[in-house]
Amino acid sequence: MTLNGWIQIALYGAIVLALVKPLGSYMTRVFTGERTFLSPVLGPIERGLYRVSGIDDRQEQHWLAYTGAVILFHVLGFAVLYAILRLQAVLPLNPADQTAVAPDLAFNTSTSFITNTNWQSYGGETTLSYLSQMLGLTHQNFLSAATGIAVAVALIRGFARASSGTIGSFWVDVTRATLYVLLPICVPYTLFLVWQGIPQTLGAYADATTLEGAKQTIALGPVASQVAIKMLGTNGGGFFNANAAHPFENPTALSNLVQMVSIFAIGAALTNVFGRMVGDERQGWAILGAMGILFLAGVLVTYWAEAHGSSVLNSFGLTGGNMEGKETRFGIAASALFAVITTAASCGAVNAMHDSFTALGGLIPLLNMQLGEIIIGGVGAGLYGMLIFVIVAIFVAGLMVGRTPEYLGKKIEAKEVKMAMLGILCLPLMMLGFTALATVVPAGLAGPANAGPHGFTEILYAYTSAAANNGSAFGGLTANTLFYNSTLAIGMLVGRFFVKIPVLAIAGSLAAKKTVPASAGTFPTHGGLFVGLLVGVILIIGGLTFFPSLALGPVVEHLAGAAGQTFATGG
């Protein structure tokens, strides 16, 4: 642990905090229909899109209609992406002559990108054409991110409105999220990445001769445009198999910093949007404060674990920390910070190999996902995931004082609590259920490259990542099989829709309620006491649910390593 490392972490936190208010103010104006500085340019385009699509932007939807639109949007997106992948060999922009993607892999990949997971059981440069990368994956990166933002805004309206039968229009929300938020940032962001050295070309792969005379093919493509939205939209899927560790995706320390900032930018700013739309910015800062506490704790543990290395490494005199699987241009601090950021959000991009982290260093990214990625989280998904925990925390506070729980003037009743618990419990069902299955069937046991607790963690990490819609992986798992492609895809679908649908049900229920004036007995939800309660509820639920699985994996691995015990490679 070095002063330079701490400065990097502090600088990152300061930049993200500095963006919260201006970006939050801008997005509030976008989603409340107010005029912005981009309205003169984008307004005519927006209205033109509505006319072509037959959408009345003044017609709002009941929560059931909003939910139906969300599901339909995903179904259509899946069908288009699946068709592109299966027909890849006969479609244009395929200079490397990539063949059609296999049915099970196409199913997994299509599910992955429409759900904002971006799990990849393949290497992009050896599997996909430029058309598949652009029209298929990059396109869905925009739409899946916009969908998450739209659902979060719908839930905010549920808290902000009173006696209302509608929560907005999905078609308007997803259009504005794409047109006014994602695209205006991604265009200059892409140009910045090109300046940093990331390729953006439709030219064929380049053939090169090394200094030793060997022939080498250098993969190229429209990389910068995909990297920009994969980071900003917390999608995470890499153009190349090495993801953000590849020098063509993340070549410099500056590009690394900007990419890390962009992962958190929208998610952090949405807490400010929440505060502004409910009429009390302190509410947003309280939620961001809870997120910040959990994030900082994760960074401290991961940085400490990686900087101190493992007892096995230290026994060989390697006392410089754990550099295995890390890029020297980033070092331990930036790699540990990136790992916590990408799993606190639902991004999943990596600039180091998580499978090569120490046992405790790998535990934190795993735990971040198991908590539901509510520490900033994915664009939109992080906020509505955290608000689910807020509802549970308010319910617990109400039980302790014997009062009907209230939040922002809305009574939290049985329906909201049931929907919140459904959204929370569907994740461990997928994460732990499929992990248990994979450890007892031959097709599952054939996947991990390592024996013992680390092999178990590789399986647990995969299903946790899929259900949490993260997409990062312990790379030692061979996942491109019928068993893993199918079960991981099911986990992604349940993790996406069995959270979104309860969230929209909560939004509709709250929007229809009247606002109750605050009284002397109302529990304040903008101070330190509430932040502490919220953090406690998150850790208790996460700890009770996932501690047994963590004990079987990274905890046992750490204790065994401290005792000098290692496990042979091989599942």
UniProtKB/Swiss-Prot annotation:
Pfam families: KdpA
Membrane topology category: Multi-pass membrane protein
Spans through the membrane: 5-25, 64-84, 136-156, 179-199, 254-274, 285-305, 330-350, 357-376, 421-441, 488-508, 527-547
Places the protein is found: Cell inner membrane
Keyword Glycoprotein listed: no
GO MF annotation list: P-type potassium transmembrane transporter activity; potassium ion binding
Annotated keywords: Cell inner membrane, Cell membrane, Ion transport, Membrane, Potassium, Potassium transport, Transmembrane, Transmembrane helix, Transport
UniProt KW DNA-binding keyword: no
Superkingdom of origin organism: Bacteria
One Gene Ontology term, aspect cellular component: plasma membrane
InterPro entries, alphabetized: KdpA (IPR004623)
Disulfide bonds: none
Entry's family note: Belongs to the KdpA family.
Main function: Part of the high-affinity ATP-driven potassium transport (or Kdp) system, which catalyzes the hydrolysis of ATP coupled with the electrogenic transport of potassium into the cytoplasm. This subunit binds the periplasmic potassium ions and delivers the ions to the membrane domain of KdpB through an intramembrane tunnel.
Subunit structure: The system is composed of three essential subunits: KdpA, KdpB and KdpC.
Protein name: Potassium-transporting ATPase potassium-binding subunit
